[in-house]
Amino acid sequence: MKSIKRFALSAMGVAMLLVLTGCVNVDKTTGQPTGFIWNTIGAPMAEAIKYFATDKGLGFGVAIIIVTIIVRLIILPLGIYQSWKATLHSEKMNALKHVLEPHQTRLKEATTQEEKLEAQQALFAAQKEHGISMFGGVGCFPILLQMPFFSAIYFAAQHTEGVAQASYLGIPLGSPSMILVACAGVLYYLQSLLSLHGVEDEMQREQIKKMIYMSPLMIVVFSLFSPASVTLYWVVGGFMMILQQFIVNYIVRPKLRKKVREELAKNPPKASAFSKPSGRKDVTPEQPTAITSKKKHKNRNAGKQRSR
């Protein structure tokens, strides 16, 4: 399980780097974004920011907020679908707690590497039997579809002509802002806390708690070295993530919980049974046998004494 957690944390870091830099190329001589993703998605976003900022006279700060909200609303169905799959996995874990808990307890109480391996295999087998993914039900396809949009808006917020010289609420958009960094960190931390809502499985809650600081920490670190225009995009993104989490917690999760319970009511699962780990043998002698043996010896000696 520890290796899976390390893999998940590493994947988050790599995914974040890919989101920010992997989808858009940057010209080494000019430092300007180029490539298919930028020309197809990023450049129109930059033009939209300029339109709201200059043509409508709203300023670059408000323009970044508007374009970010529009982009987030476009990809919101993908985010909801991704959360739907993860929530379905969570609800299955909650409903099958009585089936999986013995394996989880066995894994916690294992003392040797062999016992831990056997317990893990038994747990994974039970999860597979009931259609539960060991990776939490999160698919790669929705994430991959969202990445070009995240990358494009990231570069659009940073490289739109005129944004580096502008300001928003007295905050220069061309240099880092500690106020916006703090806001972004708090918002993503709140979103992480909201993701715990409705998760009843103890092991799953522990995994989420251990990763709860990763997203805010990564946002804060990147924001410290990014202009305020980019951090403003992350602040708005944090609000949208909280909105998405509320939709999942209070609309998606209740429906999925009802669906899972109805399915399990029709086809109730059987509690998993597992044998004791091989390698442990009970060498304690049976007490009744020992008592019977003593009685036989006593009767034999008594017969000898009478014959004498």
From Swiss-Prot:
PROSITE patterns: PROKAR_LIPOPROTEIN. Residues 1-22 form the signal peptide. The keyword Kinase does not apply. It comes from the Bacteria. GO terms for molecular function: membrane insertase activity. The keyword tRNA processing does not apply. Keywords: Cell membrane, Chaperone, Lipoprotein, Membrane, Palmitate, Protein transport, Signal, Transmembrane, Transmembrane helix, Transport. InterPro entries: YidC/ALB3/OXA1/COX18, YidC/Oxa/ALB_C, YidC/YidC1/YidC2_Firmicutes, YidC_ALB_C. A lipid is attached at C23 (S-diacylglycerol cysteine). One of its GO terms (cellular component) is plasma membrane. CDD domains: 5TM_YidC_Alb3. It is a multi-pass membrane protein. A lipid is attached at C23 (N-palmitoyl cysteine). The chain crosses the membrane at residues 60-80, 135-155, 168-188, 211-226, 232-252. One of its GO terms (biological process) is protein insertion into membrane. It holds the Pfam family 60KD_IMP. Residues 293-308 have a biased composition (Basic residues). Residues 263-308 are annotated as: Disordered. Its main location: membrane. It is found in: Cell membrane. Required for the insertion and/or proper folding and/or complex formation of integral membrane proteins into the membrane. Involved in integration of membrane proteins that insert both dependently and independently of the Sec translocase complex, as well as at least some lipoproteins. HAMAP family: YidC_type2. Belongs to the OXA1/ALB3/YidC family. Type 2 subfamily. This is Membrane protein insertase YidC 1. It comes from Streptococcus pneumoniae serotype 4 (strain ATCC BAA-334 / TIGR4). The gene is yidC1.
